[in-house]
């Protein structure tokens, strides 16, 4: 039996972005493309098929100069007036309280924005500036996906600040934070460490206090940028003290294509509501799902005894309780965001790395990320928190591994645990993996939830 229950202490080694903007020069040719040829056909087909089901954003690049990736965080600090030194953070947040008077009383008082008003391009010059590769390089000589999650989170916030920018305000009174990662679908398996990367994105839907942001990542090869992933984030605007919702500028379409994108954003909102309403934490499983759970139960009964308690693991299977990894993080000031709480991108990176390790241990081979979906930021993580992470394989099918990572903060004084995030990752392995088998009712609900997420992802790719 493969036992994966391991508790580990993982340290923080995240570098703060220094905000220096080296000159952008043409990219060097991409090297080492032989990796893709070694893939089994099922992996190659799955991870190069592209994403579907979402409208293609119109070209908005004309007249926009790209931003160096190292300048994104520094721009955010300038927009909100954040301190670069931890010892000054209390004073900086006190100064933001005075910005309350700049908040709009009604959304109708704010000027409408177009999609192209928030459009941004960010360059990650891994090919043309080799000195920045070290931060992004993994042991397999490809780009660390966790670092990409950090960059996407920062870019999404900057796009929203661009959408809500008021010309007469030197500092924004809004506190814009990530509320949800709706989905990230990858159409390439390998992100090469020696080819330039370009991120693009803009606001694609607006509520009264929330904004949906669509972002795309492309990588340069043979003189052309080819798609790597599409991402949809949902951001919320709060007051300067991050206590109450704040109104944001409405979004107006200029073309029929943009009208469809806004309609899709509204549909995405309704889908999220429906998915939440049907959650297994609120509603009983469907009749079909109950039959699935009962079949699993019957298949694990020991036929040599007439007992409901005697269970036997089927061939080529792993008990769910033996398919998990755990980790602990001490949240240092180095990992804070512009509002002096722990950076959401950092949380996503750590959760992904634990999820990847869980899938790697389970499948006994290198897994590749296929999709990220439904990451809900339920509460902020304060600096100094003890962050507990638990990665669980909750569903498998052929080469696919569905991993759920649960994140919670632990208060050592009160000994209370509070959930902060739940992450869902879909991986694909080079080989077919054993079937994960739930034993308890709670594990069966995790199994069904993982099955639901996996089915939703398979419709997208």
Where are these regions (language model features)?
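HotDog/MaoC-like acyl-thioester-processing domains
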Residues: 3-6, 11, 40-101, 190-198, ...
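Catalytic strand-loop segment that frames the active site of acyl-thioester-processing enzymes
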Residues: 53-144, 251-253, 257-344, 461
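Single-stranded nucleic-acid-binding OB-fold domains
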Residues: 141, 145-148, 160-178, 190-192, ...
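Active-site helix/loop of acyl-thioester processing domains in fatty-acid/polyketide metabolism
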Residues: 143-171, 343-367
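A cross-kingdom feature marking solvent-exposed beta-strand/loop segments within repeated
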Residues: 169-198, 364-388
